[in-house]
Structure formats: C-alpha cells, structure tokens
C-alpha cells in the first residue's frame, strides 16, 4: 500500500505539464478561458466563468491601484494609458495572453501577463 501511494505521488509530482499549468499562472488562466470560449454562449452558465471574471477583475484592480500609487509617489509608471484604470476587453486580454510565448506564459503570474498586455496596448514613450 505504501509503495502504491509513493508511486502515485512520484508520478503526479514528476509530470506537472500533463496535469496542466499550475493555478495562478497565465497559462492556467488561458487554458480555462479557451475551454469556456469553445462553449460559445453556454460559457456564461459554466461555474468557472464567474471565477475567471473575478480573477481577472481582481488582478486588473491591483494593477490599477499600483499605477495610481506609483503616480502619487512620483515613481515611473509601467504602462501609459490615458487613465490609470486602463480599458482592456476580455477577448483583447485573451488574445494578448495567447501572444505571449507559451514557455514564458507557463511561468508567469496572471498579473505579470496582464501588465505585459497593457504595456503592448499602452506603451510609454520615454
């Protein structure tokens, strides 16, 4: 019994790509979003839809708050939208995530990925 448990643990811990990207990564978010996108209008009834939306909204709010804090403190800002709360549509965000190379996307947080998408949309002219 003990050997079976150890073998199962070794198999699952040795092959994380087979299980998908770890939670919280940009790749995990994109995988879940693409799964919902494939459902078409029925995606709105999937329980993961609300979680994805809340996750993206929370990350966006955090980035906006960071930008406001940077402006107030006189630090350089990381993206240059006309307002601190940048506009980013859901499909625009998903397409931006897909444009990030898979190797990088698998190792970056959703916040880092969203910042990269915002920097591409709203580059700073320095």
Regions found by a protein language model. Give the residues of each.
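C-terminal partner/receptor-binding element of secreted or periplasmic proteins
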Residues: 104-126
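Enrichment for repetitive, rod-forming helical segments
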Residues: 9-10, 39
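Positively charged n-region of N-terminal signal peptides that target proteins for export
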Residues: 1-4
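Cleavable N-terminal signal peptides
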Residues: 7-8, 17-18
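N-terminal signal peptide c-region/cleavage motif recognized by signal peptidases
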Residues: 13-15
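Short, highly charge-biased, low-complexity peptide segments
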Residues: 58, 62, 98-109
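Short N-proximal segments of mature Sec-exported proteins
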Residues: 21-96, 117
